[in-house]
C-alpha cells in the first residue's frame, strides 16, 4: 500500500513544494517530520516525459513529483514547530470526527469541515455531484462565510471592532488548516476587506475586493490562474455580485420566509450564471435540479457546519461528550444525504455534455438570457 504527502524540499536551488510518493509509513508521520530518502525526480508539468503540459500541480504551487526509491529515514524532531500548527489541528479534528461520528456521517462532516473527501461514500459523493451539491464538499468561500457567520452569531453585532479582530485571524487560520486553496483565500481577503472598510469609514466595494484578491493570489503564484477551483470560485462570486442584487430587489416587503427563500434562490442563480459553462466544460454535466437542491439543503448545510464544528471542538476537549454532541449534526447530515438521494432518482435531473446538441442547447440558453 502506498501513500503520498506534500513536502518541502530542503535543498538550495530547488522549488520548495513537491508531492512525495512513498509507502504507507508516511501516513503515521506528524506534520513537520523530516524525510531523508533517495527519490526519482519528475517534473510536475510532464511526469511521464512525453511532452505533456499539465497545470493541475503547478496551479497549486507544486513543480516537482518525487517517487521513493529504497528505504527512507524519518526524523520527528521538528514536528512540533509552530508553523505546522494548522496541519496538526487538521489531523486532530479528523481524528475527533472519526471517534465521535459513525462512518457515513463522519465522512460527510470531514469533507464539509476539512475538504477531505477520500472517506466519503462513493454513492453519496455521486448523488451530491449529480444534484449540484458537490461544492459543499470542496472547502471554499462558502465555508469561510459559514465560519464568519458562526463567529458573528456567537459574538453578536455590538462590538464590531472586537468581532473584526477575532473573525479575521480565525478565518485565515481555518484557511491554513484546510489547505489554503485559491477559493478560500479569495473569501478570506474579501471578508476581511468587507469587515475593515466600515471601521475606516469606507463603503465595501465587492468588485474591488474580488479584483484585489485575484491580484494577491496571482502575485504569489501566476500558475494559479489554471486552477479549476479558482476559476469556479471567482466566476461564481462575480455572478453573485452582478446578478443577485438585481434579483433580490423583488424580495423587499415580502414575508420573512419568502424573503429568505428568494435570497437563497437569487444567490444560487447568481453563482451559476458564470460558473455553469466552466463546470460543463470541466466536468461534462449540468444538474437541472441544482436550484432546488441548494434551496432545500444549503441552509441545512450551514447548520450542520456550525453545529458539527462546535461538536468536534467540544469532543476534542472532552472526548466523553463526543457521541452526545454529534447527535444533532448527524441528523442534519442524514437529511442532506437523503434529499440528495431522492433528487438523484428524478428523471432528467442532469444533462450530460457529451454531444454537440447539448452544447448547442447551452449556448442557446445563454444567447436568450
Predicted feature descriptions by range:
Residues 101-104, 205, 225, 340:
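Proline-centered turn/helix-capping motifs that create local helix->coil transitions or kinks
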Amino acid at each position: 500500500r502506498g501513500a503520498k504527502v506534500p513536502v518541502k524540499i530542503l535543498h538550495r536551488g530547488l522549488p520548495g513544494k513537491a508531492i512525495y510518493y512513498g509507502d504507507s509509513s508516511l501516513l503515521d508521520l506528524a506534520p513537520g517530520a523530516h524525510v531523508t530518502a533517495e527519490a526519482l525526480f519528475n517534473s510536475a508539468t510532464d511526469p511521464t516525459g512525453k511532452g505533456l503540459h499539465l497545470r493541475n500541480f503547478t496551479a497549486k504551487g507544486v513543480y516537482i513529483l518525487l517517487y521513493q526509491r529504497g528505504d527512507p529515514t524519518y526524523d520527528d524532531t521538528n514536528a512540533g514547530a509552530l508553523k505546522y500548527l494548522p496541519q496538526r489541528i487538521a489531523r486532530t479534528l479528523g481524528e475527533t470526527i472519526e471517534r465521535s461520528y459513525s462512518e457515513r456521517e463522519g465522512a460527510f462532516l470531514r469533507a464539509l469541515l476539512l475538504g477531505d473527501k477520500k472517506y466519503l461514500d462513493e454513492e453519496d459523493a455521486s448523488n451530491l455531484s449529480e444534484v449540484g451539491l458537490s461544492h459543499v464538499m470542496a472547502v471554499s468561500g462558502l465555508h469561510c462565510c459559514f465560519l464568519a457567520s458562526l463567529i458573528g452569531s456567537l459574538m453578536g453585532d455590538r462590538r464590531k471592532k472586537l468581532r473584526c479582530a477575532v473573525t479575521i485571524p480565525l478565518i485565515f487560520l481555518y484557511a491554513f488548516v484546510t489547505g489554503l486553496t485559491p477559493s478560500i483565500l479569495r473569501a478570506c481577503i474579501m471578508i476581511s476587506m468587507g469587515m475593515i472598510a466600515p471601521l475606516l469609514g469606507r463603503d465595501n466595494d465587492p468588485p474591488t475586493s474580488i479584483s484585489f484578491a485575484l491580484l494577491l493570489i496571482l502575485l504569489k503564484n501566476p500558475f494559479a490562474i489554471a486552477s479549476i477551483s479558482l476559476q469556479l470560485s471567482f466566476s461564481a462570486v462575480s455572478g453573485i455580485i452582478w446578478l443577485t442584487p438585481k434579483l433580490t430587489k423583488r424580495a423587499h416587503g415580502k414575508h420573512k420566509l419568502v424573503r429568505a427563500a428568494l435570497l437563497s434562490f437569487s444567490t444560487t442563480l447568481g453563482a451559476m450564471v458564470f460558473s455553469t459553462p466552466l463546470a460543463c466544460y470541466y466536468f461534462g454535466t449540468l444538474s437541472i435540479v441544482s436550484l432546488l437542491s441548494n434551496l432545500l439543503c444549503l441552509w441545512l448545510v450551514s447548520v450542520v457546519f456550525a453545529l458539527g464544528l462546535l461538536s468536534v471542538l467540544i469532543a476534542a476537549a472532552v472526548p466523553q461528550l463526543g457521541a452526545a454532541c454529534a447527535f444533532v449534526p448527524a441528523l442534519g447530515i442524514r437529511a442532506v444525504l437523503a434529499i440528495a438521494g431522492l433528487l438523484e432518482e428524478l428523471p432528467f435531473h442532469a444533462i450530460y455534455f457529451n454531444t454537440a446538441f447539448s452544447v448547442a442547447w447551452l449556448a442557446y440558453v445563454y444567447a436568450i438570457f
